[in-house]
Each structure stands twice: as structure tokens, then as C-alpha cells.
From Swiss-Prot:
This is Phosphoribosylamine--glycine ligase. It comes from the Bacteria. PANTHER family: PHOSPHORIBOSYLAMINE--GLYCINE LIGASE, PHOSPHORIBOSYLAMINE--GLYCINE LIGASE, CHLOROPLASTIC. The gene is purD. The lineage of its organism: Bacteria, Bacillati, Bacillota, Bacilli, Bacillales. NCBIfam families: purD. It comes from Listeria monocytogenes serotype 4b (strain F2365). Its cofactor is Mg(2+); Mn(2+). ATP binds at residues 134-195. It is an enzyme of class 6 (ligase). Mg(2+) binds at residues 284, 286.
Length: 420
């Protein structure tokens, strides 16, 4: 089989690498991909992730068996719809189902309708009304841009000053453009966060091993929200009972509800959850693999990944098995200044010194004219290591991160400490 992955980040690197482990996969192409993927025999195709005609044309020429669409933007722009209309099998929700990620307001109304546990919230398009509601609710409070903002459109405000600033940025300064013309204000939930992703086909839900992401930029969960600074899987302090409850009360009702709404969901449903005193509740839904969670969850998949996706695309029951022992830890190397203002084009040092048994997933990198890797984004790459315990994983992984030390980049040194 020849397969095509759409996207260019660390998530797509992990997806492509896992597909290449499958028995009957010959070639994996990534459009547009990044230069670091080539090191794992992934073939790059110079087509943008939203170029529907280009993707269709290539898929036909290269005799692609199926396409996996990685990021949220092409999903919401209807890339899966276009591929399927052209007779090409594609894994990922169509645009009308991807709305569960594309609009926080839609997701909130949907959860309310289907009694899926989440924080109380209200949606606003008028700044004065939103500000009045903020004054009434007080802090801590959470303010979210309705649309896509690359994981940065959420402010968890502990002080009123911070809340008002976030609201002004979104509604008056239009910090996220059209994405923040509508704003969701929701109650703050206290508890332990975790990510639960599942393979979904209509009403069928096949959960993956859970992961814990680290959203804040700096140690001790301080600083602004990012796309994610590191992750690990599984999460030893979240019990199987809690995960089962989340599948029963959140994922299954969501999958069934989407079918009822005429928004048949086939793809990855990602639930960002928080374990509160009343049980697990939804912080957010995403319509695709999480990044960086994918880089620590997919390596733990024991079943044949390509066969699994192929089964779902043929409405067959997939074989979904994850490793039961050990833990996988991943730490992101980011450009200094991320998630705000950062430079591109800084040379990466020490990459060739990283131990062979440590996985390198490239995200914001490219090669210069001397074939040296330079930065090309906020999150540059992720190193991942599997070990028996978290203490072992941290002891083995962080010396490898230190090989990449460079004033132009930074990483969090506390990823995984909660699981020790």
C-alpha cells in the first residue's frame, strides 16, 4: 500500500513513522511534511495541506490506498469531503463533523443537548455583555476564543485584570481574527487534566491509551498556554475506572450525538478532560490526533496501525491494542519566545549526538543549504523515550534534551514529575 499523510508537524511525523512499521505498507508520503521526516524514510510532497486539487491529483497518480488528514485546519476546510467526493478513501471527519473542534460554542451547545459533563458557560459576541458577565461570575474563570487559535485561544484567568485583558484582546483587538469575534466564558474547573483520544466510526468508539499534556509554557504550569510542551502515556494516577467512565459518559454519547445531528464522525475524537470531584468533565473536544500526545501514544500501539485505519475505512472492527507495561515520555524543544514572538532560522545543535534509542519527531524544522537543521516554527521538535517507570524515563530522556541546549531554544524540565 501507498499512503498519504496531510500535515507538517510532529504529530504527522509520528503518524507517518508508525504507518511505515505496518506489514503491507510500501511508501508513506507526507504533504507538505518537514525535512526531518526524511530521516525516517517518509517521502515529502510539496503540496499545501489545504490544496484539495493538488492532494486529489497526487493521490490518484501515486495510487494512494488512503489518506490521513492530521491538522484541524484542512479538516475544517473540507479536505476529507473533497477527497471522498473524488473517490479517494480519507481518514478524518468531514467539515460538518470537525465543527466539534472548530467552534467552542457549537461544542458547548452540543454537550448541553446530550448531557455530556462540562463546565457551565455562556457565549458572547458583545464586549459589554461579556464584561458584565465576567464581573458577575468573578475569578478564577476561563475565556476561550470560539474558533481555531492553534491551542493559544484559551486564558485561564486567576485575577480579574488578566480576565479583562484577555477579553479585550479577543473581542476588541481581534487578537485571533474571526476566531475571537465570538467568545465563550466558562467556569473554572479544578482537578487533574488528561487527554483521551479514540478511533471513532459513527457510533463505534475504540479508545486509545490516555496521555497527559502540559499546556503552559513554563515549569510549574506557569506562563501562557501553548500547543503543548510535552506529554506522557499512560497516566498512572488516573485509574481505569475513571477512563471507563469517561468513555461511557463522554465519548460514546458524543459519537452517538454526532450521528443524530447528521454529522457522522469518522476519525479521531480527542477529549481534553479534567477529573473533578464529580468525575471526568470535558474541557475541549478536538477532531484529530493531539500534538504532542500522538508522539507518546502511537508508539505504544501494538496492533498494525495501517490495518487498523483500513478496517475503520471499510466499516470493519479494528484490532486496537496498546502496551500495558512501561511509560513513554516526550519533551518539546521550542523556540525562545514561543508562544508569543520568536525567531525562525536558528541552527539546531547536538541533534546527531542524541542516543539512537530516543525517538526524534520533527515539527518546526527545515534544512538549510548545508543540510543543517534550522528552526522553522514555535515548537521545533520532540524527543521521546520509553522506559519501565517515569523516573527511568526522565533519567534517560533529559540528558538527551541537554545535548540540544542552546540559548535560542527552551524546554520544560518538569514534564512527567506528576507521574513519578
Amino acid at each position: 500500500m501507498n499512503l498519504l499523510v496531510v500535515g507538517s508537524g510532529g504529530r504527522e511525523h509520528a503518524i507517518s513513522k508508525k504507518l511505515l512499521e505496518s506489514n503491507n505498507v510500501e511508501n508513506v508520503y507526507c504533504a507538505p511534511g518537514n525535512d526531518g521526516m526524511r530521516l525516517d524514510n517518509i517521502q515529502l510532497v510539496a503540496i499545501s495541506e489545504t490544496d484539495k486539487a493538488g492532494l486529489i491529483d497526487f493521490a490518484k497518480k501515486a495510487e494512494i490506498a488512503f489518506v490521513i488528514v492530521g491538522p484541524e485546519v484542512p479538516l475544517l476546510e473540507g479536505v476529507v469531503d473533497a477527497l471522498e467526493e473524488a473517490g479517494i478513501k480519507a481518514f478524518g471527519p468531514k467539515a460538518n463533523a470537525a465543527l466539534i473542534e472548530g467552534s467552542k460554542d457549537f461544542a458547548k451547545q452540543f454537550m448541553e443537548k446530550y448531557a455530556i459533563p462540562t463546565a457551565a458557560s455562556k457565549t458572547f459576541t458583545d464586549y459589554a455583555e461579556a464584561k458584565a458577565y465576567l464581573d458577575e461570575r468573578g475569578v478564577p474563570i476561563v475565556i476561550k476564543a470560539d474558533g481555531l487559535a492553534a491551542g493559544k485561544g484559551v486564558t485561564v484567568a486567576l485575577e480579574m485584570e488578566e480576565a479583562v485583558l484577555a477579553l479585550k484582546d479577543m473581542m476588541l483587538e481581534e487578537k485571533f481574527g474571526d476566531a475571537s469575534l465570538k467568545v465563550v466564558i466558562e467556569d473554572f474547573l479544578a482537578g487533574e487534566e488528561f487527554s483521551l483520544m479514540a478511533f471513532v466510526n459513527g457510533e463505534e468508539v475504540y479508545p486509545m491509551a490516555i496521555a497527559q499534556d502540559h499546556k503552559r509554557a513554563y515549569e510549574g504550569d506557569k506562563g501562557p498556554n501553548t500547543g503543548g510542551m510535552g506529554a506522557y502515556s499512560p497516566v498512572p494516577h488516573i485509574s481505569e475506572t475513571v477512563v471507563d467512565e469517561a468513555v461511557e459518559k463522554i465519548l460514546l454519547p458524543a459519537a452517538k450525538g454526532m450521528v443524530k445531528e447528521g454529522r457522522y464522525f469518522r476519525g479521531i475524537l480527542y477529549a481534553g478532560l479534567i477529573l473533578t470531584a464529580e468525575g471526568p468533565k470535558v474541557i475541549e473536544f478536538n477532531a484529530r490526533f493531539g500534538d504532542p500526545e500522538t508522539q507518546v501514544v502511537l508508539p505504544r500501539l501494538e496492533s498494525d496501525f495501517a490495518a487498523l485505519i483500513d478496517a475503520l475505512l471499510h466499516n470493519e472492527k479494528p484490532d486496537v491494542r496498546f502496551k500495558k507495561s512501561g511509560i513513554t515520555l516526550g519533551v518539546v524543544l521550542a523556540s525562545a519566545g514561543y508562544p508569543e514572538h520568536y525567531e525562525k532560522g536558528n541552527k539546531l545543535t547536538g541533534l546527531n549526538d542524541v542516543a539512537e534509542d530516543v525517538a526524534i519527531y520533527h515539527a518546526g524544522t527545515k534544512q538549510d543549504e548545508n543540510d543543517d537543521f534550522i528552526s522553522d516554527g514555535g515548537r521545533v521538535l520532540l524527543l521521546a523515550k520509553e522506559a519501565e517507570t517515569m523516573t527511568d524515563a526522565r533519567t534517560l530522556l533529559y540528558p538527551e534534551m541537554q545535548k540540544l541546549d542552546n540559548p535560542n531554544f527552551f524546554y520544560r524540565i518538569d514534564i512527567g514529575t506528576k507521574a513519578e
